[in-house]
Amino acid sequence: MSTAGKVIKCRAAVLWEKNKPFSIEEVEVAPPKAYEVRIKIVATGICRSDDHVVNGSIITPLPAILGHEAGGIVESIGEGVTTVKPGDKVIPLFVPQCGKCRACKHPESNLCTHGDLGRAQGTLMDGTSRFTCKGKPIHHFLGVTTFSEYTVVSEISVTKIDAASPLEKVCLIGCGFSTGYGSAVKVGKVARGSICACVWSGRVGLSAIIGCKAAGAARIIAVDINKDKFAKAKELGATECVNPQDYDKPIYEVLQEMTDGGVDFSFEVIGRLDTKVSALMCCQESHGVSVIVGVPPNAQSLTIDPKVLLSGRSWKGAVFGGYKGKDDVPKLVADFMAKKFPLEPLITNVFPLAKINEGFDLLRAGKSIRTVLTF
């Protein structure tokens, strides 16, 4: 029996308060309004940005259903939707693409002015929620909200992908993989034969390593305090691995000595302020490019000597690897299907939604690269 136009009751992981576990609840998901799409989520990844909300370092209205990296199937569409139809495989886009605003029209920008990123309203574009639980409205997250069996998104926040693609794998393209891979090939524009350093070797850092390798870097140095990650980093393309705890000097000095003055490209992936400065300092002073990838804590600022940049270093940043969601995500899925890069090595656990708290525990303990939740 068709569910189009009807309220759907389903399971979702609700975060009622910060620093509390997720609670599996029955929620009601309203049908999509005009220019909205209701999606049955098949698989969703647990991202460190979700945990930043749990611990309060990223602020968004609560209670909320988090999750922003997923793959699913369109269940129904609202009036006026033309880019997807029921039955399509899709990836929700936490960085939307309306195609009409100034940012969308600029070839080097991917931050649509209609996105919830940075505003954290916790609603869809009309200022309301499609979720209720126990009679209370539940907030959305980044306009996508994927820790739920069903979700509703704006049409500008979803893109159709290859019908043959495995959603439990390509869901990673919805955030972490694209963020790391794009930071190397699209934002940093790693040059063939160059020397690169990836500061931190979690899932996004490993994706940056994959990107550096794809771009033809001659040396790729993985930096992490967890030596257990080094084997995977080398499997995916790192030529050397460095643990800062093995040295009695700043890690940027170690990297400068290893590379005759500094790397050509560096990628800071963890989001710590001190590692952002180290990643910049380890670059070659006349031409090195450092890309900020990791999400920094709220309400904190960096202090650096301007002469560090005056000599010729460049400091760049981008969200979602600089990719325009509707334009680029289907291409990335096609590239995965053509075996141009792997996703399987990044997935360490596949859990049902009921084990979401176990997945977050593994993330916090540094014992997983990516945990995928299935419904």
From Swiss-Prot:
Amino-acid positions noted as binding Zn(2+) 1 in the UniProt annotation, renumbered to this chain: C47, H68, C175
Modified positions (N6-succinyllysine) in chain numbering: K234, K340
Signal peptide (from-to): none
A GO MF term: all-trans-retinol dehydrogenase (NAD+) activity
Gene Ontology cellular-component terms listed: cytosol
Name by which UniProt lists this protein: Alcohol dehydrogenase 1
Catalytic activity: a primary alcohol + NAD(+) = an aldehyde + NADH + H(+); a secondary alcohol + NAD(+) = a ketone + NADH + H(+)
Cofactor note: Binds 2 Zn(2+) ions per subunit.
